[in-house]
Amino acid sequence: MNNLPQKCRSVVGLHFCRKFSCGNVLYQDTAKKTVLYDFHKKHDGKMVDFAGWMMPVQYKALGIKASHHHTRKQASLFDVSHMLQTKIYGKDKESFIESLVVGDIKGLNANSGTLSLLTNENGGILDDLIINKTNEGYLYVVSNAGCSDKIKAHFKDQVQSFKSQGGDVLIEHNDNGLLALQGPAMVDVLQNGMKQKLSELPFMTNVEDIIFGIPNCRVSRCGYTGEDGVEISIPIEKTVEMAEALLENPKVELAGLGARDSLRLEAGLCLYGNDIDESTTPVEASLTWCIGKRRRAEANFPGAEIILKQIKDKPDRRRVGLTISSSIARHGAEVEDEKGTKIGIVTSGCPSPTLSANIAMAYVARKHNKVGKTVLVNIRNKKIPATVTKMPFVPSNYYFVK
């Protein structure tokens, strides 16, 4: 990893580069571009290859730390158009998706959503995704860019199998733009541009609306920062217009992958390919809450036998937060006990701009993963003390209707 470009190491962190190439490793000849690529260049975005897409890691106007703070205090605009957006139709659409994920999708209210997990027969996580039930007769699903090809193929295979058994379902992937407006000023910025009262749209609900004169937009109150925010799905030909309209507000600044990563880590949110993958189960990943009560009783999701046994007996390891006394623990750093025995591994780590401390996520053995426990992290051959810490590291500010 030391052979990676310096901007990968210092700006985004090594964990971004483990699976997704940055800067000079893979460049524009092979990477795809979102509809906002020229917009990013116009606004002096520093572009890197992430998950096969040319994306801004930061902008000239604000460094990553300043962008991070701006998101916590005002509002930042992120391009997340590289993510896979899918619509699922048919009278059996909920039964179909429940045959693949651990969540209670049938139990969702109209225009509400949930984080869920696609699992395999071994209980491993194929992807994490947001599933929204809409009033327009379809499920709206957002999943990770890095898993796009895998998930498309998986959906295709599963649709064929489901239909062969008489099920009625249709999958449609769309190329809409996707913008995330995140931060406490989001409501002030967005409310004047839409009919829906945001005071009546709590966390993890969604609505189709006309936004700043642009029809057929879907607004979902969610995000990847721990702040109040929305993700807006926009017809591709209107995405630049929407971005420019939002950026006209002086409370809004553009933000890139660098700030997005430190924000999500402070919020205790996983990055697929680093913190979760096909070798980790929902229970090991501390995502047991994603498994619906009814789904546990029915035990009919992929890997249910293994996952439910782990819920009952406790897994041998679990994803936890670490606060580190000094130095930055990057992906792959080993966690040890006081005797020098390996007891875990770091999956993500960065300096926390909010806390002015070094934080990380790690999988740690059961005996050592209790909050308050002191462990050692091997950083450049030095044993650095760290404390197992409850996540999120920074309190979340999601909006709920009282």
Question: Which positions does each model-derived feature cover?
Answer:
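Conserved, structured C-terminal
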Residues: 5, 16-17, 21-51, 55-59, ...
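Glycine-rich, Trp-frequent "lid" loop and neighboring beta-strands that shape
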Residues: 130-131
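Context-dependent free N-terminus signature
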Residues: 1-3
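Acidic, proline/glycine-enriched N-terminal capping motif
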Residues: 5-8, 13-119, 124
